[in-house]
Amino acid sequence: QNPADVKATHVADLMFNRSFLDPVLRGEYPADLVALLKSYDQLPACKPEDGFLIAEGKIDLLGINYYQPRRVKCRDSAVNPQSPFMPEWFFDSYEMPGRKMNPYRGWEIYAPGIYDILINLRDNYGNPRCFISENGMGVENEQRFIENGQINDQYRIDFISEHLTWLHKGISEECNC
């Protein structure tokens, strides 16, 4: 593995996953995220009691929203230092060869991603109680699929079925969903 890609993946995980999961499941922000934000003068102002509130504010049930995977690689070009600070300063999007796509929205369809999320929660966050709060497939101009007064949405049935298969796999491996 390319070390620069591994670093980009780590930063994306910090920004898009751990910045939300760690406070509500561990009671603190990841130290490496805090250091990164501080080094770019992006750390929000906090009061001394904020740390206590975060530590005590753990949740009982986690809602998971999953539509598509986020795949990243190291940046191919330098960042414009005059541009606003964004997570994308640290990585570029990566397009997996042979990926399955939702042609109506341009999103990758990767049903095993729901399983990956559950395994991460089980192995790295103490297997919290969770549920899938959002998952689905957006399609533009669905009226074009109307046949005899009914929408032929086999594409959506297949999407949900594939995701439920991977959800079931996670549950069968003792994920608490």
Positions of PLM-derived features:
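Active-site region of glycoside hydrolase catalytic domains
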Residues: 1-177
